[in-house]
Amino acid sequence: VRPLNCIVAVSQNMGIGKNGDLPWPPLRNEYKYFQRMTTTSSVEGKQNLVIMGRKTWFSIPEKNRPLKDRINIVLSRELKEPPQGAHFLAKSLDDALKLTEQPELKDKVDMVWIVGGSSVYKEAMNKPGHIRLFVTRIMKEFESDTFFPEIDLEKYKLLSECSGVPSDVQEEKGIKYKFEVYEKNN
C-alpha cells in the first residue's frame, strides 16, 4: 500500500479556510510549493493524484480546475457524476483509495495527496499505515471558519528534514511561515 500524503497550510489558530477561501492574503511562493509538491512525480510516465472534498474543489478558481498535471478525485456522497473538470468521483476516502488500486489507475499513479478539507484530512490522519503530513505553519492568527484537526504527536513525529522542503522561515507580504513534515508509520 502506497503512503498517503496530506498537504495543508494552517494559521497559528489552526485555521485553513474562511468563506470558501484561504484566511490569509495569497502567498505566491507558498502556492508554488503546494504546486511543486503535489505535481512532481518521482517516476517517469506517472502522475500524482489529488483527493479533495467537494467544497475544496469548488473553492478552486474555475480556471485552475482540475489541478493540472495531476489526476483529480472529488469526494461527495451527494453528487451523481464528477463535477465538470474532475477526473473521478468517489463517495468516500476509502473508495477513492480503492480506485487508485484499480487497473486503470494503478500503473499511472505515483504519489497520492490529500488536499482538503477538514473532514478529509481528519479521516486520512486517523488511518493506519504510512502517512505524511506536509504542513505550512503560517506564523500568525487569521480569522477562520474551517480548521485543521489536531496532530497527535504520540503518533506523528516531526521530521528534522525532508528532501525538497526548505527548512528556513519564509516571508511574503509581511507574513512569516515555515514548512514542516510529520510522519507516522503504524
From Swiss-Prot:
<keyword id="KW-0560">Oxidoreductase</keyword>
<comment type="subunit">
    <text>Homodimer.</text>
</comment>
<dbReference type="GO" id="GO:0006730">
    <property type="term" value="P:one-carbon metabolic process"/>
</dbReference>
<feature type="binding site">
    <location>
        <begin position="76"/>
        <end position="78"/>
    </location>
    <ligand>
        <name>NADP(+)</name>
    </ligand>
</feature>
<feature type="binding site">
    <location>
        <begin position="15"/>
        <end position="21"/>
    </location>
    <ligand>
        <name>NADP(+)</name>
    </ligand>
</feature>
<keyword id="KW-0007">Acetylation</keyword>
<dbReference type="InterPro" id="IPR012259">
    <property type="entry name" value="DHFR"/>
</dbReference>
<feature type="binding site">
    <location>
        <position position="70"/>
    </location>
    <ligand>
        <name>substrate</name>
    </ligand>
</feature>
<feature type="domain" description="DHFR">
    <location>
        <begin position="3"/>
        <end position="184"/>
    </location>
</feature>
<dbReference type="GO" id="GO:0003729">
    <property type="term" value="F:mRNA binding"/>
</dbReference>
<feature type="binding site">
    <location>
        <begin position="54"/>
        <end position="56"/>
    </location>
    <ligand>
        <name>NADP(+)</name>
    </ligand>
</feature>
<dbReference type="Pfam" id="PF00186">
    <property type="entry name" value="DHFR_1"/>
</dbReference>
<feature type="modified residue" description="Cysteine derivative; partial">
    <location>
        <position position="162"/>
    </location>
</feature>
<keyword id="KW-0487">Methotrexate resistance</keyword>
<dbReference type="GO" id="GO:0046452">
    <property type="term" value="P:dihydrofolate metabolic process"/>
</dbReference>
<dbReference type="GO" id="GO:0031427">
    <property type="term" value="P:response to methotrexate"/>
</dbReference>
<dbReference type="GO" id="GO:0005739">
    <property type="term" value="C:mitochondrion"/>
</dbReference>
<dbReference type="GO" id="GO:0004146">
    <property type="term" value="F:dihydrofolate reductase activity"/>
</dbReference>
<feature type="binding site">
    <location>
        <begin position="116"/>
        <end position="123"/>
    </location>
    <ligand>
        <name>NADP(+)</name>
    </ligand>
</feature>
<feature type="binding site">
    <location>
        <position position="9"/>
    </location>
    <ligand>
        <name>NADP(+)</name>
    </ligand>
</feature>
<keyword id="KW-0963">Cytoplasm</keyword>
<dbReference type="GO" id="GO:0046653">
    <property type="term" value="P:tetrahydrofolate metabolic process"/>
</dbReference>
<dbReference type="GO" id="GO:0005737">
    <property type="term" value="C:cytoplasm"/>
</dbReference>
<keyword id="KW-0496">Mitochondrion</keyword>
<protein>
    <recommendedName>
        <fullName>Dihydrofolate reductase</fullName>
        <ecNumber>1.5.1.3</ecNumber>
    </recommendedName>
</protein>
<comment type="function">
    <text>Key enzyme in folate metabolism. Contributes to the de novo mitochondrial thymidylate biosynthesis pathway. Catalyzes an essential reaction for de novo glycine and purine synthesis, and for DNA precursor synthesis. Binds its own mRNA and that of DHFR2.</text>
</comment>
<feature type="modified residue" description="N6-acetyllysine; alternate">
    <location>
        <position position="32"/>
    </location>
</feature>
<feature type="modified residue" description="N6-succinyllysine; alternate">
    <location>
        <position position="32"/>
    </location>
</feature>
<dbReference type="InterPro" id="IPR024072">
    <property type="entry name" value="DHFR-like_dom_sf"/>
</dbReference>
<dbReference type="InterPro" id="IPR017925">
    <property type="entry name" value="DHFR_CS"/>
</dbReference>
<feature type="binding site">
    <location>
        <begin position="30"/>
        <end position="35"/>
    </location>
    <ligand>
        <name>substrate</name>
    </ligand>
</feature>
<keyword id="KW-0521">NADP</keyword>
<comment type="similarity">
    <text>Belongs to the dihydrofolate reductase family.</text>
</comment>
<keyword id="KW-0694">RNA-binding</keyword>
<comment type="pathway">
    <text>Cofactor biosynthesis; tetrahydrofolate biosynthesis; 5,6,7,8-tetrahydrofolate from 7,8-dihydrofolate: step 1/1.</text>
</comment>
<keyword id="KW-0554">One-carbon metabolism</keyword>
<dbReference type="GO" id="GO:0046654">
    <property type="term" value="P:tetrahydrofolate biosynthetic process"/>
</dbReference>
<dbReference type="GO" id="GO:0050661">
    <property type="term" value="F:NADP binding"/>
</dbReference>
<dbReference type="InterPro" id="IPR001796">
    <property type="entry name" value="DHFR_dom"/>
</dbReference>
<dbReference type="GO" id="GO:0046655">
    <property type="term" value="P:folic acid metabolic process"/>
</dbReference>
